[in-house]
Amino acid sequence: MTEYKKVIAHNKKALFQYFIEERLEAGIVLKGSEVRSLRQGKASIEESHAADTGHEVFLYNCHIAEYEKANRFNHATRRPRKLLLHTKEIKKIIGRIRIKGYTLVALSMYFNKKNKVKVELGIAKGKKLHDKRESIKEKDWKRDQSRLIRQK
């Protein structure tokens, strides 16, 4: 089942720095100037993460550039943004990220089929240095394999 997604931003570092154990989709509360800026593709979620504040989940460090035509109605570029999730999902997430070593990272931000902005989140556990080295070796080996196959 392929679903339409127009990707705005992708967090490649998260896949290298974390083991992603579970993925989920969340809506996000945005202002009008933020949506216009996202339509131009001016967003970065490289350092972003999500955290709970009681019964809500917020996305921190997500950079959405200012929309130049918004004048005085512009938004703060790195403000915390509320994520829209069902209560069951929030309780499940809070239970998982309260365990030592787990965090909630933003993997990608995209427009869905109905033109709503969605954020793909991952419940993740941090990699150690030797795990990162291992993933680099695997990536290099796959690249070498594909080169060998193309040469034949």
Curated annotation (Swiss-Prot):
It is found in: Cytoplasm. GO terms for molecular function: RNA binding. The keyword RNA-binding applies. InterPro entries: SmpB (IPR023620), SsrA-bd_prot (IPR000037). Keywords: Cytoplasm, RNA-binding. Gene3D superfamilies: 2.40.280.10. It holds the Pfam family SmpB. One of its GO terms (cellular component) is cytosol. GO terms for biological process: trans-translation. It comes from the Bacteria. Required for rescue of stalled ribosomes mediated by trans-translation. Binds to transfer-messenger RNA (tmRNA), required for stable association of tmRNA with ribosomes. tmRNA and SmpB together mimic tRNA shape, replacing the anticodon stem-loop with SmpB. tmRNA is encoded by the ssrA gene; the 2 termini fold to resemble tRNA(Ala) and it encodes a 'tag peptide', a short internal open reading frame. During trans-translation Ala-aminoacylated tmRNA acts like a tRNA, entering the A-site of stalled ribosomes, displacing the stalled mRNA. Belongs to the SmpB family. PANTHER family: SSRA-BINDING PROTEIN, TMRNA-BINDING COMPONENT OF TRANS-TRANSLATION TAGGING COMPLEX. This is SsrA-binding protein. It comes from Rickettsia peacockii (strain Rustic).
